[in-house]
Amino acid sequence: IVVEMDPIKTSFEKWAKPGHFSXTLXKGPNTTTWIWNLHADAHDFGSHTNDLEEISRKVFRAHFGQLAIILIWLSGMYFHGARFSNYEAWLSDPTHIKPSAQVVWPIVGQEILNGDVGGGSRGIQITSGLFQIWRASGITSELQLYCTAIGALIFAALMLFAGWFHYHKAAPKLAWFQDVESMLNHHLAGLLGLGSLSWAGHQVHVSLPINQLLDAGVDPKEIPLPHEFISNRDLLAQLYPSFAEGLTPLFTLNWSEYSEFLTFRGGLNPVTGGLWLTDTAHHHLAIAILFLIAGHMYRTNWGIGHSLKEILETHKGPFTGEGHKGLYEILTTSWHAQLALNLAMLGSLTIVVAHHMYSMPPYPYLAIDYGTQLSLFTHHMWIGGFLIVGAAAHAAIFMVRDYDPTTQYNNLLDRVLRHRDAIVSHLNWACIFLGFHSFGLYIHNDTMSALGRPQDMFSDTAIQLQPIFAQWVQNTHALAPGSTAPDATASTSLTWGGGDLVAVGGKVALLPIPLGTADFLVHHIHAFTIHVTVLILLKGVLFARSSRLIPDKANLGFRFPCDGPGRGGTCQVSAWDHVFLGLFWMYNAISVVIFHFSWKMQSDVWGSISDQGMVTHITGGNFAQSSITINGWLRDFLWAQASQVIQSYGSSLSAYGLLFLGAHXVWAFSLMFLFSGRGYWQELIESIVWAHNKLEVAPVIQPRALSIVQGRAVGVA
């Protein structure tokens, strides 16, 4: 049996002793530093004990608490939809009425935030996309939202109970946490497989019929309730005749019978401007089948299937030494290493989601709600950025706390660490190259523009730098439905090309996005900022245990201010310091992405369409010619758009104005820390000097980082 019964008795005594988890903090405060350390270490389970089983149980228990908080938060969202929103009004006229789910009380004049959202209601216009997802899932009344909110609270209570139960009553043993094959099978088949299958089932039996009727203009109050569709097959058969045949076509392999509600059309629904919900139901069913198969691939009690340890240990090539040997032990004993990998993958996936939300808008009427589109893109980019920086943070914690050099000899990890100087100096060169060349193209354009020589600028109308590879990818995908997917009526996304335009309620939902010289230029800025972020984060991980500047870093821990008073040049050199220096560049990278997205969409996609079919874009298609100079970015995007936000203070949009101001305050605050990163720069310089020595081109005069005082002088200037 893999659980231990009644390991820890339930008591509230410890709650009365702040800092009970630490010998030093439990004594109580001497200075104000105590409260900071209390917050820093309360959830750092690795510092409370060295017992991996106990740490694992605490993390496992915390996950249930986290789920409870998420469910309570979601319940609040649904409750607002049920109690304070105009959802039913929006549902009846989604092209004219704006979504609102919060009405501000008249306290100290805050009621200015309540704008006219149409349909006779006033409130804050929301940009979370919840109304659109509710419609897609078949919610037709505020009562249904209310019931869902109550359901979420019940689930939250269950999660809190589970957290208590699996720590105090039946706690899993370490072996259970380390049984990776069983975990993979259950997560793949259970969470992803059955999860997707149940969502596909909900879509087919509830969402599709309700949305079909809504699209046809049926009054939401006339539509049968969800449980009626589930219990009464005749209702579904009226909309999809093949429902009358039940499961016979499934078992007789006559699957094409189901093609009424499991489609492969591509493109967007012209009524709602969202993906065809019959396509998404088909997609989730297919995903479910794939993951149910994947959940049977790993070897557990029966002697068949994959063993991860075997896979990793036999995975070696001619140039990689011991290959992946030793990684299995790392990933089953260091949860930081495990978390780092998961954060890196989930962060990348979140950014992929950001780009799919606008190019393949999944919910009805999402594509014509431009504020929501912008918010969802921004949200997913930020979340992805945070997760990726978090990956580097936990990789560095793994290096400091969990890495044992004696067990890792000549495997991939060891080999990467041994040639870290080459990695960092090459990456540094790539950053310098990208920075000078990408900005150089802009500076050239600014100069030529100032000298009145437009024919010498890099632009679509002068010296062209067309993104030919991106255009080739677009073209291939635009042509795909005719060849690789003969039954599809349109390509996966209208953005690829092919001339299709979908407009809903006189607004453009989506159209082919042209790429030109302006995009080529800004994409190289993206490449530059991403590489700088990677340089900082990777340097933090590779030099987390030691460097030429501080050979004994591993003994100082993950975060330390300076290596003692006698070594002033060693400040801001810990692995933790690299995290916030990396965050700064992540913010820079993400800002350029969001600027690019919002201007490009307003210039080339979003806008209104006349009865004659003439499209008028919000900023009139000025991206291609304006964004090719720094001056154009400053004047036609930053100033042109910020001035509206800055002047919003007397209107219902003032909250956005304040958030805009606050976000810039946060960014400016982060600048302050950059200018004193003395040790960080010295450490980087020593890697680069190593590269020069190796090529025998090292200068006689030693390069040295600015002192903290010099750095601050530069910062002030």
UniProtKB/Swiss-Prot annotation:
Belongs to the PsaA/PsaB family. Chlorophyll a binds at M672, Y680. InterPro entries: PSI_PsaA, PSI_PsaA/B, PSI_PsaA/B_CS, PSI_PsaA/B_sf. Disulfide bonds: none annotated. P700 is a chlorophyll a/chlorophyll a' dimer, A0 is one or more chlorophyll a, A1 is one or both phylloquinones and FX is a shared 4Fe-4S iron-sulfur center. [4Fe-4S] cluster binds at C562, C571. Its EC number is 1.97.1.12. GO terms for cellular component: chloroplast thylakoid membrane; photosystem I. Phylloquinone binds at W681. Keywords: 4Fe-4S, Chlorophyll, Chloroplast, Chromophore, Electron transport, Iron, Iron-sulfur, Magnesium, Membrane, Metal-binding, Oxidoreductase, Photosynthesis, Photosystem I, Plastid, Thylakoid, Transmembrane, Transmembrane helix, Transport. This is Photosystem I P700 chlorophyll a apoprotein A1. It comes from Cycas revoluta. Signal peptide: none annotated. One of its GO terms (molecular function) is 4 iron, 4 sulfur cluster binding. It holds the Pfam family PsaA_PsaB. It is found in: Plastid, Chloroplast thylakoid membrane. Gene3D superfamilies: Photosystem I PsaA/PsaB. It catalyses: reduced [plastocyanin] + hnu + oxidized [2Fe-2S]-[ferredoxin] = oxidized [plastocyanin] + reduced [2Fe-2S]-[ferredoxin]. The chain crosses the membrane at residues 59-82, 145-168, 184-208, 280-298, 335-358, 374-400, 422-444, 520-538, 578-599, 653-675, 713-717. The PsaA/B heterodimer binds the P700 chlorophyll special pair and subsequent electron acceptors. PSI consists of a core antenna complex that captures photons, and an electron transfer chain that converts photonic excitation into a charge separation. The eukaryotic PSI reaction center is composed of at least 11 subunits. PsaA and PsaB bind P700, the primary electron donor of photosystem I (PSI), as well as the electron acceptors A0, A1 and FX. PSI is a plastocyanin-ferredoxin oxidoreductase, converting photonic excitation into a charge separation, which transfers an electron from the donor P700 chlorophyll pair to the spectroscopically characterized acceptors A0, A1, FX, FA and FB in turn. Oxidized P700 is reduced on the lumenal side of the thylakoid membrane by plastocyanin. One of its GO terms (biological process) is photosynthesis. Its main location: plastid.
